[in-house]
Amino acid sequence: MNYQAVIGLEVHVQLKTDTKIFCGCSTTFGASPNSQTCPVCLGMPGVLPVLNKKVVEFAIRAGLATNCRIAPRSVFARKNYFYPDLPKGYQISQYELPICQNGHLDIEVDGQVKRIGITRIHMEEDAGKLVHADVPGLGSGSGVDLNRACTPLLEIVSEPDIRSADEAVAYLRKLHQIVVYLGICDGNMEEGSFRCDANVSVMPVGSTTFGTRTETKNVNSFRFVKQAIEHEIERQIELIEEGGKVVQETRLFDPNTGETRSMRGKEEAHDYRYFPDPDLVPLVISNDWVEDTRLSLPELPDARRSRYRSELGLSDYDAEVLTATREMAEYFENCLAAGAPAKGAANWVMGEVTRALNEAGKDIAECPVAPARLTALLQLIEKGTISGKIAKTVFDEMWQSDKAPEAIVEEKGLVQVSDTGAIEKIIDEIMAANMGQVEEFRGGKEKVFGFFVGQVMRASKGKANPAVVNELLMKKLKG
């Protein structure tokens, strides 16, 4: 029997706010354990939570970017469970009335576009963290670090529309790109800023009844998500075919083995005994707030890619690379605003600029060559002042010295030679020294032409105008 996977993803997005969702404690990552806490996030008796307005704004931004309906009224709820890293004994979340509902994202896998529904986006606080290692002052064992407790999260819940690990990764990558573009999350998966719970079940092909699902918790890389889902699909099919039954449970992914393992029985919603939090009034969001937020959104990757193709004539590949990050797209567009040709700017940003950034271990936001300076370099190429080859040398000097390209060209005497008399003299000397290759060319071996071009460029130290060289060489070689 053939089986079909059914996958739904719950993505936890840690919001890039300076302070926590219900108190004023810092959200800075990496501080010493329990140094960023207060009575509110420690769950002390008598304290009251105060909602961080920035968290609501970020939630609205996420909802609009994922085509959700923004609820005019939403409610915070207490999710009750006991765990050492949850000091209050409950988590403040949203349940029946979340802030965002009924959205979608379109993904592309193997050239096919598919729409993945988004059930809801809700705000909640993160729990603390258990540290299983040598604890300073306590020796080996387990410690509880509550710095992360009360850190703001969005939980983005997809419909069970995903049918393969590849589709799951495509959806996750797109969602990751969007939240980073919006500036609401740093996207750092290693630090847990963007992590995923994967709900997986299998059913016979053609069936409309979903199988029993498992939930694999807190997978924090695209590669691990793919491995975890593929293993879970394989495990469930094998179990069913051997006559066993899939148990509804929570599982963990082990990156060392590439397998999932049982963690605990999977709870149902009623196990958490949700009820409205009496310490937080219902959240009312005006239409004006939503529309003001909509106007403040940056142009998102899909819209940018479409514009680059239709208005700038760029290829699908170029548009994809240039919109990979918001910073890359803005650097490219700043080049255009300074007067750079679209294709030339695209080639240089994807080529020399990216190469230099990778070698230096920098992000494009740290690029020492400003867009206006890169544009000035491209304009020197367009005018014929320097060749593309010389331009790369000039760029390297710009990277190191922060000098204008015009100054470097003048200082180093790099102006392109277009004087036909000077170029003809070089060609004549090279032909006289390589008569064997001249005869080969005239005998029909046209590949030799590249040899002569290389010799002329070498003799001119790269300064000869390639177009003039090609024209004069062809004329002289043909005799």
Curated annotation (Swiss-Prot):
Family annotation (SUPFAM superfamilies): GatB/YqeY motif, Glutamine synthetase/guanido kinase
GO molecular function: asparaginyl-tRNA synthase (glutamine-hydrolyzing) activity; ATP binding; glutaminyl-tRNA synthase (glutamine-hydrolyzing) activity
Domain of life: Bacteria
Presence of keyword ATP-binding: yes
Reactions listed under catalytic activity: L-glutamyl-tRNA(Gln) + L-glutamine + ATP + H2O = L-glutaminyl-tRNA(Gln) + L-glutamate + ADP + phosphate + H(+); L-aspartyl-tRNA(Asn) + L-glutamine + ATP + H2O = L-asparaginyl-tRNA(Asn) + L-glutamate + ADP + phosphate + 2 H(+)
One Gene Ontology term from the biological process aspect of the record: glutaminyl-tRNAGln biosynthesis via transamidation
Keywords: ATP-binding, Ligase, Nucleotide-binding, Protein biosynthesis
Ligase listed as a keyword: yes
Catalytic class of the enzyme: ligase
Pfam families: GatB_N, GatB_Yqey
SMART domains: GatB_Yqey
E.C. number(s) listed in UniProt: 6.3.5.-
InterPro entries the UniProt entry points to: Asn/Gln-tRNA_amidoTrfase_suB/E, Asn/Gln-tRNA_Trfase_suB/E_cat, Asn/Gln_amidotransferase, Asn/Gln_tRNA_amidoTrase-B-like, GatB, GatB_C_1, GatB_Yqey_C_2, Gln-tRNA_amidoTrfase_suB_CS
Residue ranges of coiled coil: none
Complex formation: Heterotrimer of A, B and C subunits.
NCBIfam families: gatB (TIGR00133), PRK05477.1-2 (NF004012), PRK05477.1-4 (NF004014), PRK05477.1-5 (NF004015)
Family of this protein: Belongs to the GatB/GatE family. GatB subfamily.
Biological role stated in the UniProt entry: Allows the formation of correctly charged Asn-tRNA(Asn) or Gln-tRNA(Gln) through the transamidation of misacylated Asp-tRNA(Asn) or Glu-tRNA(Gln) in organisms which lack either or both of asparaginyl-tRNA or glutaminyl-tRNA synthetases. The reaction takes place in the presence of glutamine and ATP through an activated phospho-Asp-tRNA(Asn) or phospho-Glu-tRNA(Gln).
Stated name of the protein: Aspartyl/glutamyl-tRNA(Asn/Gln) amidotransferase subunit B
Source organism of the structure: Geobacter sulfurreducens (strain ATCC 51573 / DSM 12127 / PCA)
Gene: gatB
